[in-house]
């Protein structure tokens, strides 16, 4: 069935699970909190701050062949938040980026990618000029399952952050504690941009 482009644009970042999971060629299997993850030594931990947390988006990126399983681990990252980037994605959504914000504890996921999976993710993230690939270190991050993490790779916006009068705008769909700024849904942020660019429309 062909995907409705308007629905895709308006529903970013798409449904995000509440627990860690294995993504395997479009199928997801929950990882129990007491389950031990193995085989991560040769994988790269990449923090997902927007739609890469959602199996729906992972299914769009990893299709057409057998990509193998991807462990996707729920975390709580301290002193950062998921906020909007000031650009429009090719599919019409206002996407996310990571911003340092003291006192915020944001629920995000880490994708553990093997070499082939990482190459594919690069193709979907850094083929344009909107995101760069980097490393965050010295983090305070709690993991639901798997080994402790002190550093993680990330695709972060090269455009900065989308701000209103109070600062960067958090994603309402991404759970967080300690926010002092009003978060907006995808529809709300699109309306905000419309009103800024074309008041009274």
Residue ranges and their predicted role:
Residues 1-201:
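Glycine-aromatic micro-motifs
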